[in-house]
């Protein structure tokens, strides 16, 4: 673990000025998901500073796993947009993390800050497989439970909105629709023409409330010009902006995944993770 941190994290530390552990986690997020990337710095999570822990969380939310890029591309999203967004997410996530939670402590990544013995190796292949399966199952159960709870909560909120909207002739009222209206100014600020801002804001809202996969799925017909906006196909400029904006795990469900994943790796930091 130590030599990997010195090799990869050290390079990013010099370029970005961040600690080696958070830099390595950000780099790993380019290739793997938000629950797998923190595993490369797992021995250090429990002793990370609040700023480092927040940077790890931001990196996971800002990026997507490399394994899902093909799925998004099959919906019609240009692969060059997805790859560019993934690589931009690593330094971008660290940048915003440090703006929101600046480092006020002294990060440490030596053996005294690690949770357990870094040199503790499995006795053989069977021991390694058993330990990996046990850790993986614990992580999956925690993530699954948190994800189920958050999705259920969102469904309950949408049910309430739909019922209230039905009283006023708007049974289609939902959290996603409200966020679409709410995020239309944001869509306009990032370059989407106002005539397309409400539609773009709706996709951003879907990404935030549900997940980016559902948002891309609903965005696909616009990419193929199967759905028109006021009788006109969505502009290529807007398609590119939305493709970048949706490429990330930042949504309410991912908060549950982070809480379950990082919480199982460092139970003593669960409160800090939830507050972040």
Task: State where each predicted segment sits.
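Alpha-helical membrane-protein architecture signal
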Residues: 23-24, 118, 122, 126-130, ...
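Long, contiguous bundles of hydrophobic transmembrane helices that form the permeation core
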Residues: 87-139
